[in-house]
Amino acid sequence: GCATTTVKSSPEDFIRIEGQDLIAPDGSKFFIKGTNLGNWLNPEGYMFGFSKTNSARMIDQMFCEMVGPDFTAEFWEMFKDNYVTRADIEFIASTGANTIRLPFHYKLFTDEDYMGRTVAQDGFERVDSVITWCRDNGLYVILDMHDAPGGQTGDNIDDSYGYPWLLESEKSQQLFCDIWRKIADYYKDEPVIL
């Protein structure tokens, strides 16, 4: 991934915008054809088949209540290691797709408790893997902070407390911007990211 491999790129390697069109490095119009990797880095209840336990926070709490925090932490590590793999990306590429949307929870780039970890989240490690797999298979990646600090919709999909606090909380807004700056700086030379 980007953490272990230096990506040598120039502006010509990136998809660019001309008017309303996306332009591929070869000069042709680029049309996004793809899918997303939902539920992997931002668990959602409906994707697990749950009817009432629907946000990442609630799912984690339910698991902790049912099997305890130690097994829950082990479960999340196994889940992240196996829910999406290189083979999945290879299959997606074989269908003719050219892009993957990667929804993620902001906590993957913080030291907040999330998916079994209490410090040193593994967001860059997880995204690095997807980027490497996508680069190897000719796919682009759209990074999607699906769960922003404070929540951006107030619905279960953003793991909020029922209100879009991101829109009112300066602390949440600052954290949102800080995380995106960190991600942008880390991946600034990676042309696979749209």
Name the predicted role of every residue range.
Residues 17-24, 29-32, 37-194:
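Active-site mouth of glycoside hydrolases
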Residues 2-4:
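N-terminal Sec signal peptide cleavage junction
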Residues 7-21:
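Short acidic, Pro/Gly- and aromatic-enriched capping/linker segments at domain boundaries
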